[in-house]
């Protein structure tokens, strides 16, 4: 678990950021995980991590929403060989990692928030052989 407290002082910019948290500095973040050893060298891993909302940038006041991601791995391992079937973002959580605020659409070029979304659910296999 992490706690972070940031505070901008003496900042001169287009908007007033005095006494505001810095960009990409969530106040709370956490990660918890566990491994379960099954029979015959099989195992299961689960980890959950998340963060509270944060400001996208020091050039505007838009913020992300808090989010939590779950990852799962089912694997097999022996002395020389490891194989994992993994799923990242198990519940296919829709979340934003970056935010940009500017005018990009003619004719009025009104400032609009554009978000970069985090990765969707990913499923993969990792195989390792030690020789």
Regions found by a protein language model. Give the residues of each.
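Generic, ordered loop/turn and secondary-structure boundary motif
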Residues: 23, 68-70, 91-96
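Gram-negative outer-membrane beta-barrel transporters
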Residues: 1-58, 128-130
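C-terminal beta-signal and adjacent terminal beta-strands/loops
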Residues: 53-54, 76-131
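Residues that define the transmembrane beta-barrel architecture of outer-membrane proteins
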Residues: 26-30, 66-70, 77-79, 119-123
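Residues embedded in well-ordered secondary-structure elements
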Residues: 23, 35, 63, 74, ...
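Extracellular loop and loop/strand-boundary signature of outer-membrane beta-barrel proteins
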Residues: 15-21, 57-61, 69, 110-115
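Acidic side chains
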Residues: 47, 57-59, 71, 84, ...
């Amino acid at each position: 678990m992490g706690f972070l407290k940031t505070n901008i002082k003496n900042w001169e910019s287009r908007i007033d950021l005095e006494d505001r948290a810095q960009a990409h500095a969530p106040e709370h973040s956490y990660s918890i995980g566990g491994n379960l050893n099954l029979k015959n060298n099989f195992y299961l891993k689960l980890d959950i991590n998340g963060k509270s909302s944060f400001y996208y940038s020091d050039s505007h006041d838009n913020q992300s929403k808090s989010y939590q991601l779950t990852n799962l791995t089912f694997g097999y391992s022996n002395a020389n060989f490891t194989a994992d079937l993994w799923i990242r973002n198990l519940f296919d959580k829709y979340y934003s990692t970056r935010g940009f605020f500017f005018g990009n659409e003619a004719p009025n070029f009104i400032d609009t928030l554009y978000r970069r979304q985090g990765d969707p659910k990913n499923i993969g296999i990792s195989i390792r052989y030690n020789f």
